[in-house]
Regions:
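Intrinsically disordered terminal and processing segments
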Residues: 2-100, 106-172
Length: 172
């Protein structure tokens, strides 16, 4: 059909073969916060990070406990068809309450930034100064000296997220 060839959406009256819209644009599947972290990037490769038993065992050998609960999606920005880094949204847990962080890395998997994405259940997580301390560290060698229980929760979450990136992308 004409809709199929033009990649228009037959379920949307505004999407016609002459004006299909962006409904098939892969960038629309990338969270806004991740896209904003790489503003120059137009092409993305979302990659499911489903941990295998080998991944979990490799992480454990490096001192990090991962489980199937850590499965996630890694957002890989592409520049000239090559990976330019990664973006990962992940949960941290403090006193039984989840809050969400965004980690970005460069193409060598060194942390560029860690920031709070959503912390309504743990508002005190928003004002921590600890996030800047991760910048420049390799994802598989995260270390800081956390002083408070909340900082320790952030450190553990970043360490686990970093290891997830490492075992899935480096094949540790």
């Amino acid at each position: 059909s004409a809709e199929m060839q033009a990649k228009s959406n037959p379920g949307d009256k505004k999407s016609t073969p002459k004006n299909p819209g962006k409904w098939l644009d892969i960038a629309s599947l990338i969270p806004r916060e991740v896209r904003h972290a790489f503003p120059e990037v137009l092409t993305w490769l979302p990659q499911d990070a489903l941990l295998t038993k080998a991944d979990i065992a490799a992480a454990k050998k490096m001192g990090v406990e991962l489980s199937a609960d850590d499965d996630n999606t890694i957002y890989i920005p592409l520049v000239d068809r090559r990976p330019a880094g990664t973006g990962l949204i992940f949960a941290a847990n403090y006193q039984g309450k989840d809050f969400f962080l965004l980690m970005t890395t460069d193409k060598k998997l060194n942390i560029s930034s860690v920031s709070v994405l959503h912390a309504d259940k743990v508002p005190s997580a928003k004002g921590l100064k600890i996030y800047n301390q991760f910048a420049g560290q390799a994802v598989n060698k995260v270390s800081i000296s956390a002083k408070t229980p909340l900082e320790k929760a952030v450190q553990l979450a970043v360490k686990r997220a970093g290891m997830l990136l490492y075992v899935r992308l480096k094949g540790a």
